Amino acid sequence: MRRYRIDSMKYEQRMNAGASGFDMSDWNNPYNASPPSSRGGDDDASSVNHSRPRRSRLDNDIPQPRRPILIQPARPVSQKSNRQGTGMSNGSRGLNSTFNGYDRTYSRYHQNSSRGPSEGFSGAPSARNASGYASDYANSRAGVGLLPNNHREPVRPRSTAAERYANASSMRNGFVYDSGESDKTSEELEEDEEEEEVRNFYMEGRAQGSRSVTNTLASEVYNSESESYYYGVVKLGSAIVDHVFRTMPPPEKYYKMPPIDRVAYVFYCAVNNKPYNNIDEFHVIFNREFYSYRGYGDSKDLALFKVCKRMQEEFSLKQLEADRLAYEKARQEAAESEKLDFNQHKIEEREEPKLNISQPEEVLSNGPLHYHSCLQFATIGVGGKLVIIKPAGTIDSITGHVLSTSSVHVDDLKTFLHFDEQSGKVIESVQNFKGPLIAGQTPTHSVRLYIQRQIDALRQIRNAGDVKKSEVVDALLVWQLLEIMVQQHGRVTGPDVATLLTNASEELGEKTGISSNGTSESGSKFEAKERFNKYLLGGHINEAVESAITDGLYADAMTLIRRLHPNDAKKIEEIEARFMNLRSIDDPFATLVAVSSDQPPPILTNSAFDDDNNWKRHAAIVLANLNSQTAMQTIYHLGLLLAKRERNCAADFCLLVVCILAGYDPFIPVAHDGDETSRKHIGLVHSGSNLLNRVDGLSGTAGFSFTDLHATDIFDYALRLGNNNVDSPLAKSIDYQLARIEYAKKLSSFGGFATDAFRYCTEVARSLWMYVAAFDKNAMFDLCDLAESLQYMAAATPDESGWITTMRGMLGAAPVQESQQHVPQPQPVENKSISSEAKKWHDEHQAPLEIGSRNDQQHNDKTVEKPIAPGRASLPPPTLVTESSSESTFTDKSDSSVTVAASASRTSTLTSSTLPPPPSLPKTIEKPISTPPPISKNVVPEMTPPAIVKPPMPTLSMPIPPVSTPIMVSPQPIPIPKPVDASIAKSPRSELDDLWDTSPPSNQTSYPPAPRNIQPSYSPAPNFANPTAPSVPTPPPAVSSAPVLQQATLGQASIPNAKTTAPPVPQKQPELALNERKASKGWFGSIKEKVIKSIPSANQMILPDDSKPSIVWDPVQKRYVGAGVEEEVVAAPPPVMSAPHLMGGGPDSNKSSTNSLRSARSGVGSRYLQSGMATSQAPAMDTGMPPMMPPTMPMSFSFMPAPTEDDSSEYVDPFSGEPTAPSESLSKQNND
């Protein structure tokens, strides 16, 4: 309800009976007042009991404006004193007359009075012996000290008992007093005096026991001048005060209160037009409010004014509420009257048949109508839909027309929530965040746009006075890390993170932390050290050394070279030890030296770490220069230390960096040591939501912050961008997955987001499918119920919603302990030593095997054993992503149990009853840092592959409908890409794979011709017929053994997939596998292979099938011999090989160029002619046979390498560039 202001001028005019211009000086104006008189003119004792005595008609001549009527009771004075020449009549006292022991001087009239000194109160001569109730009423006011000290008492007014009607000639307004003259003798006067004294004695007792207006209390307690002043403070006019004292005489306790309390009481009576019954309660309430304002520093005048103003406002609100209630009551009465008239009109129309109970007269016969017009009915349906029924006769809110027929409207609930500011903010945030984020489907630029909005919002509040700037910078670091991850598709390096930290540190203006202990450094020395640290922060080691030598910082340069590039230790150690004693432990250089020496940095235990910004430089200098285990451990423990100090954003930043660079999963809870309660894991990424809520007003309504969930979603999305949308560490995070389920519920309740909510349900089910046993069953059932209720609103196909029934069957089946489940691991056919070594390493480190895809598959055609899957309950739900240009997807209609075998290599450590402690790192350093975090074994930071998960296997009797599932290439682990891989350029062959890596779905199983990464990829589930579960498990089809393009590392050129040693004897492929492999290619696959072969590659040599070698190496002649081998034609240097003759001369033979050997003797490339330009109709590399070593060519190629010019016996290996001798096994094989 709106508040009303009180116009001071109108309020003053109304309260002062229309007299404007009232100010503080009016309180000093003289006044006269007339007491109330009885109706009959006689002294009636019963008039004392009247609650509201009437004013006399003689009061019309009172001048306006006047001050409040403050009347004192007349003191008992003998009549003799009146005859002592005082010039006063009517019982008035002298100048120094006393009453009750108190001196009181007065003057009868003031200079501006309307009456003369000899006139009565009404203008007629007054009688000196007048007495009665009116006299007591007036005398009681003077006795309580309500008149100022310098004010003279007025003449005691004439009472009703002394009133006499005068002659008509002397009448004024028809009512006058007698002249007051008496012709009595002196004896009679003395008798009257005695009677008057007795009468006054009894009247005093009567006044004390009767109405409180005649109480005689001490008058010297309070000064009436201050009371008059406070009347002016609250702008209370004299007429209003006069009215209050006449109509609502205050109680006895009123005169015991201070002047401020009495003024407030009179103001209350004037505003509410009624007295406050309980004066003690009023005193308590007033003092509570009064001293509350005083406590805030207000003066007495201002506090009194605020209390009185609040009284006026409360009274105005009560009046408005009463008016509203009266209006509503009148409106209801009018409506009832209209209904009765309407019903009476309808009842008279008897000719119309009335068969429906909804007719007005029938409703009237059953009861009164509650509404007189048609109302709209609404209900909330599934998916946040609002169904509204608008009957005929209602007014359309959009068009404004009256509806002639009833209509049904379906609308989203979110359209009605925009009127609520908080709900509008939530809906706006949901619309800006394009969730769920799916790698390959959600464009990266939309995600970056959302991140940029959060960064801009944080920059807006960075300079606010009530916000800690370091907290804003920490939150900015998290969002900037997410931005660079999305921009670089999940590939982030240590220098990238160091750049973010350096910029944030410079933004806060932090100093370097270098201090000199006992030595004074000049300005040039200080600038030299600053320049030296600047190079180190950028990761420029050589430039830092040169700068240090140039500026005379030899100790810095030698220490840096000693730690990063070991040199003459004896010479440098002496200088280093002497120089490091002068360095401060807060210097980032000291941290770098300590970490590079595998020692704990002093910053972790130094008190200077209390600085909110000091940690950024130390972390930046470590990440910019080191990628060792000790460096990752330092960042990990730095994050734990920040979490212990409740720097949540900074702590999460450090843990996320370790997750990206070292593969540690920070989302799994870690057991605490002893009584330690600090946080050691991440539930949802702290993104500064408490700061962002100040800008957008968005707060979590589901028990968590939506902004934090969005930040965690973006991190998961960025990780999946780098590993082809496969599992990430967040897949088994309970906090994250449950928060996504609650978020999906919120989306479904708003309406209009049914499709997004269903996609969230599907993605959640896909992520936790292998870890469903670790989650609460009730939460999983809620997920199924939500998805089932939204499947029709989201227009989901049966394949997209088939996982709901499967998951219900998994949850309803009897729980099987994970330790009792056995999933056969894929075992290679050969290379027993490598397999046993990998198994031993796996047992020690609890990580999946990675040997098959990187070693055995290069020259072994292995088959994967299919695990026994009685039902298809452990199949993941189909993906909703569409095919994109950044990755390729493949479909598989064959038995999808391959997915189970491939998924068996994922991590599953959540089903254990207790939280696992952080695993220890291998002992590779002599001085480890306290408790090392679980970091991967490799020195180069990369994601540690998750441990093997054993999915729950349902019982055989459980009927579960089959669900289409994407094909998994091989049961290899799911490593997150290394940061080093991001800097390697793709070869033309790999770029062609990106373009041609996807074939259209067919009725048969399709395999990728040359997978770039041995990682599973999901694809849209085609509408295949649901196959029946096989009664006998059959092995899955063998994976094609096409050569895998290996990426070079650290700037080295990629080499072909071959070795100089003799390859093992290939296994004979089963006939079924060969047929399936040939059929899987199809017409499109064969065309693609021909096009790929026709394009030469700079990093790879494609070798033909050499199962039947026709050219062998002759160790005696030191050259290849065989059919079609010709002598090399020696030409002018540089030697050029002659064009080889093609054997067979058939139409399928092609000639190759003879000028391709000009770079054969360069020492770094192959000395063999590349055969990529030649094509053949013979089966290519996808026949399932492993590549044979050394490379030989079929008979149709008639290829012979050119020998060197000299006759030296050295043999040049075409793949290594160094002279080697051919192996004996190879010669023996070729001779055979």
Curated annotation (Swiss-Prot):
CDD domains: ACE1-Sec16-like (cd09233). Gene3D superfamilies: 1.25.40.1030. The keyword Membrane does not apply. GO terms for biological process: endoplasmic reticulum to Golgi vesicle-mediated transport; Golgi organization; protein localization to endoplasmic reticulum exit site. Pfam families: Sec16, TPR_Sec16. The keyword Transport applies. It comes from the Eukaryota. It is found in: Endoplasmic reticulum; Endoplasmic reticulum-Golgi intermediate compartment. Residues 67-76, 896-914, 1194-1203 have a biased composition (Low complexity). Its main location: endoplasmic reticulum. Residues 18-134, 172-193, 815-843, 866-942, 972-1069, 1140-1232 are annotated as: Disordered. Keywords: Endoplasmic reticulum, ER-Golgi transport, Transport. GO terms for cellular component: endoplasmic reticulum exit site; endoplasmic reticulum-Golgi intermediate compartment; ER to Golgi transport vesicle membrane. Disruption phenotype: RNAi-mediated knockdown abolishes localization of tfg-1 to endoplasmic reticulum exit sites (ERES). InterPro entries: Sec16_CCD (IPR024340), Sec16_Sec23-bd (IPR024298). Residues 26-37, 78-100, 817-836, 1046-1060, 1149-1159, 1168-1178, 1222-1232 have a biased composition (Polar residues). Signal peptide: none annotated. Interacts with tfg-1 (via N-terminus); the interaction is direct and is required for both the localization of tfg-1 and to maintain the distribution of sec-16A.1 at endoplasmic reticulum exit sites (ERES). Belongs to the SEC16 family. Plays a role in the organization of the endoplasmic reticulum exit sites (ERES), also known as transitional endoplasmic reticulum (tER). In association with tfg-1, accumulates at ERES to positively regulate secretory cargo trafficking from the endoplasmic reticulum to the endoplasmic reticulum-Golgi intermediate compartment (ERGIC) and Golgi apparatus. This is Protein transport protein sec-16A.1. It comes from Caenorhabditis elegans.
